[in-house]
């Protein structure tokens, strides 16, 4: 790590400790040239797979897009924001766990439906109706029947 004071390349770590929930490391460093001390924070960079859309276009994973879609389905439903965030984190973990560099958007949609089914059945039906392009009332009825099984 370069010294922020003199830009020297040689620095040493004096102290390291975990911060908060252990997802971050705080390091106290000292420059070996100018002897100034400074603090750095390290966080693991978790790379998400790229999303392959149905038209084969590839784009980076967009957590905000995932959140917006789930919140739209959950609109005016009694689900806490903590539960929504936990579901989003679970989906992100599932995506990373695939070990793939690219993942079809259809698979992400299936992960979202799994989580919505656990959170709120009405939100699940709302999302499924758009995601699976329900044509008529019969499609809704079939999906509701699956939920009741």
Curated annotation (Swiss-Prot):
<keyword id="KW-0479">Metal-binding</keyword>
<comment type="function">
    <text>Negatively regulates transcription of bacterial ribonucleotide reductase nrd genes and operons by binding to NrdR-boxes.</text>
</comment>
<keyword id="KW-0238">DNA-binding</keyword>
<keyword id="KW-0804">Transcription</keyword>
<dbReference type="GO" id="GO:0005524">
    <property type="term" value="F:ATP binding"/>
</dbReference>
<protein>
    <recommendedName>
        <fullName>Transcriptional repressor NrdR</fullName>
    </recommendedName>
</protein>
<dbReference type="Pfam" id="PF22811">
    <property type="entry name" value="Zn_ribbon_NrdR"/>
</dbReference>
<dbReference type="GO" id="GO:0008270">
    <property type="term" value="F:zinc ion binding"/>
</dbReference>
<keyword id="KW-0863">Zinc-finger</keyword>
<keyword id="KW-0805">Transcription regulation</keyword>
<feature type="zinc finger region">
    <location>
        <begin position="3"/>
        <end position="34"/>
    </location>
</feature>
<keyword id="KW-0067">ATP-binding</keyword>
<comment type="similarity">
    <text>Belongs to the NrdR family.</text>
</comment>
<keyword id="KW-0862">Zinc</keyword>
<dbReference type="GO" id="GO:0003677">
    <property type="term" value="F:DNA binding"/>
</dbReference>
<dbReference type="Pfam" id="PF03477">
    <property type="entry name" value="ATP-cone"/>
</dbReference>
<dbReference type="InterPro" id="IPR005144">
    <property type="entry name" value="ATP-cone_dom"/>
</dbReference>
<keyword id="KW-0547">Nucleotide-binding</keyword>
<dbReference type="InterPro" id="IPR003796">
    <property type="entry name" value="RNR_NrdR-like"/>
</dbReference>
<feature type="domain" description="ATP-cone">
    <location>
        <begin position="49"/>
        <end position="139"/>
    </location>
</feature>
<keyword id="KW-0678">Repressor</keyword>
<dbReference type="InterPro" id="IPR055173">
    <property type="entry name" value="NrdR-like_N"/>
</dbReference>
<dbReference type="GO" id="GO:0045892">
    <property type="term" value="P:negative regulation of DNA-templated transcription"/>
</dbReference>
């Amino acid at each position: 790590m370069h010294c922020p004071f003199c830009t020297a390349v040689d620095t040493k770590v004096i102290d390291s400790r975990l911060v908060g929930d252990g997802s971050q490391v705080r390091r106290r460093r000292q420059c070996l040239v100018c002897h100034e001390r400074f603090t750095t924070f390290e966080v693991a960079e978790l790379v998400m797979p790229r999303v392959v859309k149905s038209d084969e276009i590839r784009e980076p994973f967009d957590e905000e897009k995932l959140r917006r879609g789930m919140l739209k389905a959950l609109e005016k439903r009694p689900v806490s924001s903590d539960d929504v965030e936990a579901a989003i984190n679970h989906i992100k973990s599932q995506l990373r766990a695939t070990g793939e560099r690219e993942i079809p958007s259809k698979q992400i949609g299936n992960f979202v439906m799994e989580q919505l089914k656990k959170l709120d059945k009405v939100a699940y039906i709302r999302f499924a109706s758009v995601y699976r392009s329900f044509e008529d009332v019969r499609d809704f009825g079939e999906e509701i029947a699956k939920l009741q099984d």
